[in-house]
């Protein structure tokens, strides 16, 4: 069963069909321009309703569109079985400090046949948890970040993340803005007769299938995908994902027979793309402190889990070193 893609004939007032977006995989989805808050709520609700028998629909806020939806670690790689990531995950789940801090499940001494499959599953789920942790605090794994709160997705699409300092180890978010003159300039067509795309924030609506078995500690494993709700998989001392309403999703490794990086492209799960002009996004979000970097990326003085990661930096080697936000 596949997710239902929104058609180009939606009649939601305040939404205008722009064009079809074709990913390199061949998957095609519509781009809709959204001009009102009510229209945003309604068209998201419509996509959820269309996929009610398939699964949940999550949101990925981005500042630009690409021809794929590859996780960060797989961009620029050809090999789909990353030995460096596997080594990092083993280091985390075998470290006694993080076994306790992350409340990882423990294996049992095998006494019967079923114990071996139990231990294998425990190890696999512990690695899912560790990889989800790395995705949120290091930012480069096989997982893709999504949220189930569309104003957080809008915030992510409104901001650009810049690197600073030696080795580009420090990160800071910059809120994009649009003056009246910028708006006039941006609407002018360029030499290719295309409207400037830098004036928009985008939300990718990503559908994930329902599980056949109940989730365990926020982890859902289906035939082809893994989904981790970090608010359930990680203790709340790891505050950032709880502030962001964060989940991560990816394809399961077992289907990557050819061991290619492109296997992890999640474009097939995108059901629609919504674009909103950044001046509208800024107006809708307002100036509340809940939607600031200070809340969504709390400092290590507040986010105890973040501090734990920074204090154990010897485990987290490039490209899985913990990113520092300021």
Predicted regions and their residues:
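Catalytic-core elements of nucleic-acid end-processing and repair enzymes
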Residues: 1-326
């Amino acid at each position: 069963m596949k997710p239902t893609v929104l058609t180009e004939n939606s009649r939601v007032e305040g939404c205008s069909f722009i064009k079809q977006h074709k990913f390199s995989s061949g998957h095609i989805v519509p781009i809709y321009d959204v001009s009102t808050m009510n229209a945003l709520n309604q068209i998201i609700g419509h996509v959820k309703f269309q996929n009610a028998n398939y699964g949940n629909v999550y949101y990925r806020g981005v500042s630009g569109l690409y021809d794929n939806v590859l996780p960060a670690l797989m961009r620029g790689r050809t090999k789909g079985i990353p030995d460096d990531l596997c080594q990092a995950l083993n280091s985390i789940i075998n470290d006694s400090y993080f076994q306790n801090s992350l409340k990882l499940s423990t294996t049992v001494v095998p006494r019967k046949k079923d114990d071996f499959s139990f231990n294998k599953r425990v190890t696999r789920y512990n690695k899912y948890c560790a990889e989800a942790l790395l995705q949120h605090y290091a930012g480069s794994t096989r997982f893709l970040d999504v949220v189930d709160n569309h104003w957080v997705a809008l915030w992510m699409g409104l901001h650009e993340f810049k690197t600073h300092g030696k080795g580009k180890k420090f990160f800071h978010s910059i809120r994009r803005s649009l003056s009246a003159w910028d708006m006039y300039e941006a609407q002018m067509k360029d030499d290719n007769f295309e409207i400037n795309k830098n004036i928009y924030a985008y939300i990718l609506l990503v559908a994930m299938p329902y599980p056949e078995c109940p989730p365990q500690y926020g982890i859902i494993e289906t035939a082809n995908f893994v989904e981790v709700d970090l608010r359930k998989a990680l203790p709340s001392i790891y505050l950032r994902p709880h502030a962001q309403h964060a989940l991560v999703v990816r394809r399961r490794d077992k289907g990557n027979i050819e061991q290619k990086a492109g296997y992890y492209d999640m474009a097939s799960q995108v059901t629609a793309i919504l674009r909103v002009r950044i001046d509208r996004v800024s107006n809708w979000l307002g100036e509340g402190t809940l939607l600031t970097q200070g809340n969504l990326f709390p400092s290590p003085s507040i986010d105890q889990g973040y501090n734990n990661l920074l204090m154990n930096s010897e485990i987290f080697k490039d490209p899985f070193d913990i990113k520092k936000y300021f």
